[in-house]
Amino acid sequence: MTAIAPVITIDGPSGAGKGTLCKAMAEALQWHLLDSGAIYRVLALAALHHHVDVASEDALVPLASHLDVRFVSTNGNLEVILEGEDVSGEIRTQEVANAASQVAAFPRVREALLRRQRAFRELPGLIADGRDMGTVVFPDAPVKIFLDASSEERAHRRMLQLQEKGFSVNFERLLAEIKERDDRDRNRAVAPLVPAADALVLDSTTLSIEQVIEKALQYARQKLALA
């Protein structure tokens, strides 16, 4: 009998710290890593590259079905490869982020990308970073964590990230964009952003990243009975 690889799902809104947590957990456990948000960003970027309308579900489905994407972990960094090109930086722009949120709202697009995401499930295990990993993609995952933080704290973190990269940022505009995106993600008809019924809800608003990692790893090891 073939062993089924265990999955730890980390869901939550943008800016809660999922990416940092997932990389740390994957490194600590030596597991594979899936950044599902990157897949939607890659599809959005591919649509922009190929001049496909991100508001057209019919146009996006064939692109999603044949999306050439893979993840390569190098020295603790996750490289996102689209059609043989490293697009790790390009998919993190605000334009692509906004387009990705639109793309993710289409049922047939999500279905086309579902199989691709599930194919990342391999031994010894998978850390799955996203918004509906525990509710839709891996509903049988033995460990589910929903990482949250206040919209103000997430806007503050995003502002610091952008400022470190040399961008001039308006906090109020950034906060408004995050709230608008939250509202869209939480209230969409397909796979809304909600914690799975059996997920641990972890609020990172007042926690350091080290505290978040410690709590998440402790919970996962208890659930999986790992040393």
Curated annotation (Swiss-Prot):
It is found in: Cytoplasm. The keyword Transferase applies. Keywords: ATP-binding, Cytoplasm, Kinase, Nucleotide-binding, Transferase. Its EC number is 2.7.4.25. One of its GO terms (molecular function) is guanosine tetraphosphate binding. The keyword Kinase applies. GO terms for cellular component: cytosol. ATP binds at G12, P13, S14, G15, A16, G17, K18, G19, T20. It catalyses: CMP + ATP = CDP + ADP; dCMP + ATP = dCDP + ADP. Coiled coil: none annotated. InterPro entries: Cytidylate_kin, Cytidylate_kinase_dom, P-loop_NTPase. GO terms for biological process: nucleobase-containing small molecule interconversion; pyrimidine nucleotide metabolic process; response to X-ray. It is an enzyme of class 2 (transferase). Gene3D superfamilies: P-loop containing nucleotide triphosphate hydrolases. It comes from the Bacteria. ATP, dATP, and GTP are equally effective as phosphate donors. CMP and dCMP are the best phosphate acceptors. Belongs to the cytidylate kinase family. Type 1 subfamily. PANTHER family: CYTIDYLATE KINASE, CYTIDYLATE KINASE/PANTOATE-BETA-ALANINE LIGASE. HAMAP family: Cytidyl_kinase_type1 (MF_00238). NCBIfam families: cmk. This is Cytidylate kinase. The lineage of its organism: Bacteria, Pseudomonadati, Pseudomonadota, Gammaproteobacteria, Enterobacterales.
